[in-house]
């Protein structure tokens, strides 16, 4: 599969209109970090381009772009991408749905994994946990707070919930043993060393975070950015998105 991935990169590189290597500035949500970690270096080796990537919460990154932050390609949630489209900051023909990621529960590597196979089991796991780390400011954290309220667990979990700045830091908190459970999009937690995926949330209460890309309408490296976007969507790279806990092109 790795050979196919590199072959896809080489083919895409041949399509590029750029005469020489370029620095592609990418503003990317934390949820796509794991995919970028694997496919980014492959694209760089195959094309000679360099990816200059900054990560963060989609909502925060969207505001930065609205405030004038320059970029060539951005990967955010649909609300941010669509808002930027309306403002003319993203090329209208470049909006691309890359993948979606369900939310999952993590524990420290080697720790016992609770049963979360049903809604009732999931509720028991939350109640029995000593502490639960989550990113409250992101789309997933906002959903989780609402879900806990719908499940009638707000009071039971009030002293157990540990708000953490973002998904990756949530995973790091669990990896250090400072929280027993962590709940984030699966695509974010799989990028963190020292944690293990317990499983996705039960289907009845699952929530999906969609990763959507767009090329800047004022991109300094527009052609190279579009080449990288094509590379991310190449059939030979679908397996990487799946391995990182996401569904491609959802």
What do the PLM-derived regions correspond to, one by one?
Residues 1-8, 18:
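Bacterial N-terminal signal peptides that target proteins for export
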Residues 2-5, 13, 162:
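Residues at the start of alpha-helices and the adjacent loop-to-helix junctions
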Residues 12-20:
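C-terminal segment of classical bacterial N-terminal signal peptides
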Residues 20-67, 75-101, 106-250:
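Exported/periplasmic ABC-transporter solute-binding proteins
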């Amino acid at each position: 599969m790795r050979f196919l991935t590199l072959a896809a990169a080489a083919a895409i590189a041949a399509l590029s209109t750029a005469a020489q290597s370029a620095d592609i500035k990418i503003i990317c949500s934390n949820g796509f970090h794991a995919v970028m970690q694997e496919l980014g270096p492959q694209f760089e080796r195959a094309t000679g381009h360099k990816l200059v990537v900054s990560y963060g919460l989609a909502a925060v990154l969207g505001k930065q772009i609205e405030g004038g932050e320059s970029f060539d390609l951005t990967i955010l949630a649909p609300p941010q991408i669509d808002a930027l489209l309306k403002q003319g900051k993203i090329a209208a023909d470049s909006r691309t749905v890359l993948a979606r990621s369900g939310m999952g529960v993590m524990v420290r590597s080697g720790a016992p994994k609770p049963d979360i196979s049903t809604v009732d089991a999931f509720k028991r796991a939350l109640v029995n946990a000593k502490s639960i780390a989550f990113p409250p400011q992101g789309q997933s954290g906002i959903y989780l707070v609402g879900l806990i309220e719908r499940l009638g667990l707000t009071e039971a979990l009030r002293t157990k919930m540990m708000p953490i700045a973002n998904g990756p830091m949530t995973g790091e908190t669990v990896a250090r043993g400072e929280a027993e459970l962590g709940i984030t999009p699966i695509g974010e937690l799989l990028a963190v060393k020292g944690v293990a995926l317990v499983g996705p949330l039960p289907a009845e209460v699952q929530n999906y975070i969609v990763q959507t890309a767009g090329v800047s309408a004022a991109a300094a490296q527009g052609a190279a950015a579009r080449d990288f976007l094509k590379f991310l969507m190449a059939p030979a790279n679908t397996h990487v998105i799946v391995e990182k806990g996401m569904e491609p092109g959802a």
